Amino acid sequence: MTFNQHHLLGIEELSQTEITTLLDRANVHAEAERGSRDHGHPLRGLTQINMFFENSTRTQASFEIAGKRLGADVMNMAMQTSSVKKGETLIDTALTLNAMHPDLLVVRHPHSGAVKLLADKVNCAVLNAGDGRHEHPTQALLDALTIRRAKGRLHRLNVAICGDIAHSRVARSNILLLGKMENRIRLIGTPTLMPSGVADWGVEVYDNMAEGLADCDVVMMLRLQKERMDGAFIPSEREYYHRFGLDAAKLSVAKDDAIIMHPGPMNRGVEIDGLLADDINRSVIQEQVEMGVAVRMAVMELLAENLRDRRAAA
């Protein structure tokens, strides 16, 4: 096993070998979830604190279930009623929590880099559950596991990521991971929703679905992140769906066995046709949710192993 990280702050810090180690461990948990659900309780005696400064349904629930499956004592902090609302800084929050000696901190924050700032102030393992537009590493890992299970490999695939790339931490983490695993990545969307400097990311950029989806193995749709927009990026949702919403006609140029992905939450009729999202022969959207629990179990288990080793050596 090769996984030498103290925290999981982003895909950028992971090697190809570490990614494979995480996915292999997650696949073991995924199979156990479909069978005995016996994971051995490797986190028994450890405390996991979930701190979500942004709203979340899937990610927070997934981390909570993952921790409980592994035997951790899980605490969800209500950030809306915490001392942060009274003016406490993130650093003071980190120092306060550190004094309580937690073992795992799962953090989502609206500002890029905030999770790294917190990790520098605590003695436990920190997991980035999404920080601003920066990264969402466990989403990219669960997407990778979903792809690997559906396609039998995670290399030399044509992967299209379509939609609001500019505001998406999911896109950034997936681009980093899929690039490290030697895939061909295509970004599709209106130029107003492409980040500056995207031409230097080692990807292909298209503003036309027919060209971008041609011969693709994987089609990953992203929602319009209106909460991060500060201007008019599209003429209207109707026009956006006409040009960039995934439907059967647009998908027809992809490979016959191409899979459809979406990190959620979905806006049906905006970035994807509802019938296509529910197509059991093409859509792996529910599998993504399922793999999320397995991936988060693997990440926390490996970080906990490293944490225990460091404490034993101290």
UniProtKB/Swiss-Prot annotation:
Superkingdom as given in the UniProt entry: Bacteria
GO biological process, one term: amino acid metabolic process
Residues reported in the UniProt entry to bind L-aspartate: K86, R169, R223
One Pfam family this sequence matches: OTCace_N
Keyword DNA-binding in record: no
Database matches in InterPro entries: Asp/Orn_carbamoyltranf_P-bd (IPR006132), Asp/Orn_carbamoylTrfase (IPR006130), Asp/Orn_carbamoylTrfase_sf (IPR036901), Asp_carbamoyltransf (IPR002082), Asp_carbamoyltransf_Asp/Orn-bd (IPR006131)
Enzyme class: transferase
Binding, carbamoyl phosphate: R58, T59, R108, H136, Q139, G264, P265
Catalytic activity reported: carbamoyl phosphate + L-aspartate = N-carbamoyl-L-aspartate + phosphate + H(+)
UniProt GO cellular component terms: cytosol
Annotated keywords: Pyrimidine biosynthesis, Transferase
Functional pathway: Pyrimidine metabolism; UMP biosynthesis via de novo pathway; (S)-dihydroorotate from bicarbonate: step 2/3
Single annotated GO MF: amino acid binding
EC identifiers of the protein: 2.1.3.2
Cited PROSITE patterns: CARBAMOYLTRANSFERASE (PS00097)
Listed PANTHER family: ASPARTATE CARBAMOYLTRANSFERASE (PTHR45753:SF6), ORNITHINE CARBAMOYLTRANSFERASE, MITOCHONDRIAL (PTHR45753)
NCBIfam families: asp_carb_tr (TIGR00670), PRK00856.1 (NF002032)
Quaternary structure annotation from Swiss-Prot or TrEMBL: Heterododecamer (2C3:3R2) of six catalytic PyrB chains organized as two trimers (C3), and six regulatory PyrI chains organized as three dimers (R2).
Function, in words: Catalyzes the condensation of carbamoyl phosphate and aspartate to form carbamoyl aspartate and inorganic phosphate, the committed step in the de novo pyrimidine nucleotide biosynthesis pathway.
HAMAP family in the cross-refs: Asp_carb_tr (MF_00001)
Name under which the protein is recorded: Aspartate carbamoyltransferase catalytic subunit
Species of origin: Jannaschia sp. (strain CCS1)
